[in-house]
């Protein structure tokens, strides 16, 4: 019996030491994640190592998408500080596009998109997680029937081929999953999800999942972003994308995030720059909030320096614990004068406006871990008109919301505190 235990103990100790070595010297975790995984490995030896391989290990993604990063840089071209709205982090940051028009069309975006799809003459490129059967898929099938090149790049969860995708493919369109179905079938990790949701029509009109409609040269840049992802997934030779004529006076910069941007964190840099450069106001609406020392430090410093910082979150998140964790993470911000509101409305993407003229949109929440681990497409737009529309939309949410204060946080019941404590245990599973 003693010998049997010794035979089992040695491999377990070796596996744990390997896991601890990888966490200490190879992974790039934030302090909370680092401590969490270290505790799991120490106190749950066998389960901890298996859990680390399935949910915690990021080394495979870094190696797997490094080839994509190199090919993306070759296709998208270099970025310089002179041609950027934000401090340059070359990985993921595209060149600035001048002469664009940008509109917020959240309420009737489907009607606008259908009208533009019906007017398509050459190409429609759509990148999304899932395309269900509906009005959009029907219009895409009609476009493919009349000879428009329709390409759809979908997420791998569900293997991409939904009823809507099958309709488009049957009509002559093409569709492929972003990643291999084999990897999707055996991957249980809550990362490397496709959050790039946008559509480009004739390289002149484009739509973002956050409800932004764009006209002008930036649509061509989004076309090249799609081309980089399509080439990686399909192995096809990249096609050229025509640059459309100027359509307005907005400067737009595309910022990509995810495992194919291994050098730096471009999306984090985007939001940190916006927060730190705000002189008067910064308004943010996002699905939920998680602790992030650097970003929170910037928000607190700006608030204490006199900048009016306002943040809006939904009362009902996708997961039950996100609302409670947002309240916990917001406590330190409240202590520094940040205004926090909870709305009954649905907030599925992040929008931020700095000083009424510079705005940013992202399909992801303000979770720096998700911004590094999930694929996303983000925009930085210099436009008083678009910024005003976003501020008005967020202002409407604030008007119908309840302001969350320190008094609200301190007045929690004993049962509330138990629920908050339980929710914090799920903080790293977003």
Feature roles, as predicted:
Residues 163, 295, 321-324:
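Short, well-ordered secondary-structure micro-motifs
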């Amino acid at each position: 019996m003693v010998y049997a235990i010794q035979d089992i103990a040695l491999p377990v100790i070796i596996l744990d030491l390997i896991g601890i070595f990888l966490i200490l010297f190879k992974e790039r975790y934030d302090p909370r994640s680092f401590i969490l995984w270290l505790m799991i490995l120490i106190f749950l030896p066998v389960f901890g190592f298996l859990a680390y391989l399935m949910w915690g290990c990021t080394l495979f993604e870094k190696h797997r998408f490094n080839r994509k990063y190199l090919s993306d840089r070759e296709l998208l071209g270099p970025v310089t500080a002179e041609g950027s709205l934000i401090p340059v982090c070359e990985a993921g940051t595209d060149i600035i596009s001048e002469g664009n028009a940008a509109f917020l069309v959240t309420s009737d975006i489907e009607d606008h998109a259908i009208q533009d799809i019906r007017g398509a003459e050459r190409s429609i490129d759509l990148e999304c997680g899932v395309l269900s059967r509906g009005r959009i898929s029907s219009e895409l099938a009609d476009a493919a029937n009349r000879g428009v090149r329709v390409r759809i790049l979908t997420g791998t969860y569900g293997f991409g081929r939904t009823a809507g995708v099958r309709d488009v493919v049957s009509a002559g369109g093409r569709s492929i999953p972003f990643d291999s179905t084999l990897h999707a079938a055996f991957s249980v990790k809550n990362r490397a999800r496709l959050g790039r949701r946008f559509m480009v029509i004739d390289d002149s009109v484009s739509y973002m999942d956050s409800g932004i409609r764009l006209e002008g040269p930036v649509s061509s840049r989004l076309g090249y972003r799609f081309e980089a992802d399509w080439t990686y997934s399909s192995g096809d030779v990249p096609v050229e994308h025509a640059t459309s004529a100027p359509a307005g006076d907005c400067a737009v910069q595309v910022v990509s995030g995810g495992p194919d941007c291994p050098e730096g964190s471009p999306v984090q840099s985007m939001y940190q720059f916006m927060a730190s450069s705000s002189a008067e106001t910064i308004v943010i609406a996002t699905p939920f909030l998680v602790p992030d020392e650097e970003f929170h430090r910037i928000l607190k410093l700006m608030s204490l320096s006199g900048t009016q910082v306002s943040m809006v979150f939904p009362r009902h998140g996708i997961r039950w614990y996100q609302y409670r964790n947002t309240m916990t993470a917001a406590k330190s911000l409240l202590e520094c004068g940040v205004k926090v509101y909870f709305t009954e409305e649905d907030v599925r993407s992040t929008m931020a406006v700095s000083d009424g003229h510079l705005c940013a949109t992202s399909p992801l929440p303000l979770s720096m871990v998700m911004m590094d681990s999930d694929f996303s497409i983000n925009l930085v737009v210099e436009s008083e008109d678009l910024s005003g529309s976003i501020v008005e939309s967020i202002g409407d949410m604030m008007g119908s919301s309840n302001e969350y204060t320190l008094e609200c946080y301190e007045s929690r019941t004993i049962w509330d505190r138990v629920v908050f404590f339980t929710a914090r245990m799920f903080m790293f599973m977003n």
